[in-house]
Amino acid sequence: MQQEEIIEGYYGASKGLKKSGIYAKLDFLQSATGLILALFMIAHMFLVSSILISDEAMYKVAKFFEGSLFLKAGEPAIVSVVAAGVILILVAHAFLALRKFPINYRQYKVFKTHKHLMKHGDTSLWFIQALTGFAMFFLASIHLFVMLTEPESIGPHGSSYRFVTQNFWLLYIFLLFAVELHGSIGLYRLAIKWGWFKNVSIQGLRKIKWAMSVFFIVLGLCTYGAYIKKGLENKDNGIKTMQEAIEADGKFHKE
């Protein structure tokens, strides 16, 4: 390894003590991937909550993202492509974020002491974001893998079958809180870091952050309840397999 690389690796500076720009670039990439995922989270929540309007509305939304405007019956593979893209962005964001995680017990103790002494709200928020991000990486990966491999199962009957009969309700309740807290805290910290709303005070941004958290968690819980209710109805109506659930969704299709 070159001497310059060793110096830069230890101190983040070149041999001439010129600050390396790689860390700023990595920081920008972390912010960019986080913003994309946060915006996707917001859009995704509004889309899945369409079941609160009606089963048919949720079916139409699902088909819209299968390209039903251009392909009469829609193409589930389009959803798989989107899921694959989100997985790649999620993995990239996770690896970029890991740079700032305590990597051993000593670093964790330093952070914990700092957090205790400072008693600063944003430091506590970062800790919550780190915990939810760690949980979300595993929980969201499972959900995205299902969307990648079974895109045709997305629909009012298929999704609710997965919720109840396949017991995904347990995963989704933890994923709901992890995603909504992580996303809202992330957007708040991005707004401060990049100075997006200079006319809004930090106190104002915090209020917006908590309003977002409450709104999306309440919307998510209502949506969660709707899928549970629909999944129980599936059982009462004799739907015993995912294929039967998919066929039940197909009844909403209009030639």
Swiss-Prot record:
Binds 2 heme b molecules per subunit, called the proximal (bP) and distal (bD) hemes. Its cofactor is heme b. Heme b bP binds at residues 93, 182. It is found in: Cell inner membrane. GO terms for molecular function: metal ion binding. Heme b bD binds at residues 44, 143. One of its GO terms (biological process) is tricarboxylic acid cycle. The chain crosses the membrane at residues 33-53, 78-98, 126-146, 168-188, 208-228. Belongs to the diheme cytochrome b FrdC family. Part of an enzyme complex containing three subunits: a flavoprotein (frdA), an iron-sulfur protein (frdB), and diheme cytochrome b (frdC). This is Fumarate reductase cytochrome b subunit. The lineage of its organism: Bacteria, Pseudomonadati, Campylobacterota, Epsilonproteobacteria, Campylobacterales. The gene is frdC.
